[in-house]
């Protein structure tokens, strides 16, 4: 849990730039931290759920309604498309299926989902790429390599 907390605190340090109080964000963070403290199951997916919900709160969440089987996810525009975009920031069809699956995960059901180490590493890298595309000045996350060591 300590490594996970370090990773999430680095993310929050880079993402949260609010100068005004944000009760929705505070409530989300408070409840998430409490859940992490109390949880003994599903820890391997906690950071994925946390990051995707944080995107939702920031208004930069992927548009799931545009998904059709066989489509690719255009990370620049945040939508699923039927053709590979003309830029390099997209998820292929297989990665897009994993994203759709991920977007259905919640803190309540996260322990029911399992991912291979390869999928887990790929997904976290792609989520962080999405953050870099949509949040100004979002840097490389230094604690990511430590976090990924948990997957071994």
Please provide the spans of the model-predicted regions.
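Non-catalytic alpha-helical scaffolds and adjoining flexible linkers that form interface surfaces
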Residues: 1-152
């Amino acid at each position: 849990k300590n490594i996970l907390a370090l990773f999430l605190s680095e993310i929050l340090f880079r993402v949260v730039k609010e100068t005004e109080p944000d009760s929705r964000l505070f409530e989300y963070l408070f409840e998430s931290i409490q859940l992490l403290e109390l949880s003994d199951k599903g820890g391997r997916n906690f950071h994925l759920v946390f990051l995707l919900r944080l995107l939702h709160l920031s208004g930069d969440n992927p548009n799931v309604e545009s998904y059709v089987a066989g489509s690719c996810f255009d990370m620049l525009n945040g939508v699923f498309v039927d053709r590979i975009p003309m830029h390099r920031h997209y998820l292929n069809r297989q990665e897009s299926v994993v994203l759709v699956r991920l977007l259905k995960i919640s803190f309540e059901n996260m322990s029911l989902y399992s991912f291979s180490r390869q999928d887990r590493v790929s997904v976290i890298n792609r989520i962080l790429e999405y953050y870099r595309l949509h949040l100004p000045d979002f840097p490389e996350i230094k604690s990511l390599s430590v976090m990924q060591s948990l997957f071994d």
